[in-house]
Amino acid sequence: RGADVDNILNFPQEFDGTHIIKMEQNYRSDGNILNLANSLIGHNTKRHNKNLWTYRNPGVMPTYTYYASDYDETDSIVEDIKDYIAAGNNYSDVAILYRNSRLSYVIERSLAREKIPYKIVGGFKFFERAEVKDIIAYLCVIANPADDQRLKRIINVPARKIGAATVDKIATLAQQYKVSMMEIIRNADLYPAIAKAKPALDSFIKMYDTMCLMANGSTLGELTQSVIKYSGYRKMLEDKGVDGKDELQNVEQVVVAAEEFEHAHIKTNLSEFLAEISLLSAVDTLSSEENKVVMMTLHASKGLEFKNVYIIGLEDS
């Protein structure tokens, strides 16, 4: 990251007597794959020319298919995988590669809906990523104020001066009086144990009530976008700069997921969207670890081999 390719390209000019050795023979890929690779990389003008070759057979010709949208692309891939499995092959023979992990959501959605087991190498599934779980937790608490588990997750994310000790006291009071934690927070002035945290708790309730009001009359996408903004989550990630870029793109993808779900259903609500997410998150928990479609970035795939490989998101930019 941050490397300058000119250091390699200009090396012979900088150091007299440089001898370039080209490692062109490939022992792993079939001829048709190498021909495609040579053709593609040939468009790159800033490189030392070389031509990959092999003694292996030409093999199967790789195919390139253009799609109108990423959803069309992934739905087509999933149908192709289903045919591949129906022909007697294993899920573990299939790899789906992408340049950036943020591209994984759409293909995960399509795989999960068809109950195709998959695993992600070198990363987390979309709905297992911390920032995604945070936004989903906000939506869950809006849908159900008595969801104490999700409330614990987001009450101090971003930081609101509501520490772990205060949260534990709220949980203890809720258990003692057999009410939800939200009920305790709304009546913080009645409980001396959390009196010092009342200003911070009041601020949280004000923010929460604002988001609940937005849930009435807003689309799922608008509500999710509002949660990201008014919770302070967007600002928290933006303040992280480059380090928060991928996380911000992931939470924005939750907005896309909400919009896509709403477009696919004539009548829907927040609870139904959250139920869908729950199903997508748990689809392959009972399947064996070995026999799953493998998903990973191109970088993580180096040195690995699969019988059937899809590379998604190949776009001109």
Where do the PLM segments sit?
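Structured loop/turn residues at secondary-structure junctions
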Residues: A3, Q25, S69, R99, ...
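A short glycine-rich beta-strand->turn/loop micro-motif centered on a GG-aromatic cluster
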Residues: P117-F127
